[in-house]
């Protein structure tokens, strides 16, 4: 698990942001609990995530796990029908298009896109456009 001082710092960040710790867990200003679900496709990851989940619960966060088959997982990813997923984003040795697909605002709400986090930020878009416009490897590396 996470060291106690790190958990204390995390709780301070949450309380500074307006969350209140109560017997029902972390509550927002409307007394709604902080809760989310982690969507998995591999049941072996459940065991790996347990220390993380236990730490979140220590903070008063109600977190659950849902493991589904590959078809349902893909369908839910494509529709952005999840709170959190555990995945890796494949990269190439020449950065460019995949970063645009993962992080560009134009991809944030398109079903089936790869911008799973729903990032929509003009600063990120400008950086990605600079990356795609790079003419040399040095420019590409600097932009990445």
Regions found by a protein language model. Give the residues of each.
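Append "and occasionally in soluble cytosolic enzymes with long acidic Gly/Pro-rich linkers
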Residues: 1-54, 120-127
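Extracytoplasmic/peripheral linker and loop segments enriched in polar/acidic and small residues
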Residues: 1-3, 12, 58-74, 78, ...
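Proline- and acidic/polar-enriched loop/turn elements at helix boundaries
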Residues: 26-27, 68, 89
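Alpha-helix boundary/capping detector
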Residues: 40, 82, 103-104
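Solvent-exposed loop/turn segments at secondary-structure junctions
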Residues: 42-46, 70-72, 90-94
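Paired acidic/hydrophobic, glycine-rich loop segments that form the ligand-binding mouth/hinge
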Residues: 83-88
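Short beta-strand-centered segments that line the small-molecule binding cleft or hinge
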Residues: 95-99
């Amino acid at each position: 698990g996470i060291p106690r001082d790190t958990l204390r710092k995390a709780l301070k960040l949450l309380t500074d942001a307006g969350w209140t710790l109560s017997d029902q867990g972390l509550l927002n200003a409307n007394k709604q609990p902080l809760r989310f679900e982690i969507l998995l496709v591999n049941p072996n990851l459940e065991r790996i995530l347990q220390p993380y989940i236990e730490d979140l619960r220590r903070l008063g966060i109600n977190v659950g796990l849902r493991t589904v088959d590959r078809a349902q997982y893909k369908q839910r990813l494509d529709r952005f029908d999840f709170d959190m997923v555990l995945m890796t984003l494949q990269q190439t040795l020449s950065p460019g298009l995949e970063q645009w697909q993962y992080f560009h605002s134009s991809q944030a709400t398109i079903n089936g896109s790869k911008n799973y986090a729903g990032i929509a930020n003009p600063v990120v878009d400008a950086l990605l456009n600079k990356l795609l416009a790079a003419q040399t490897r040095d420019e590409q590396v600097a932009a990445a």
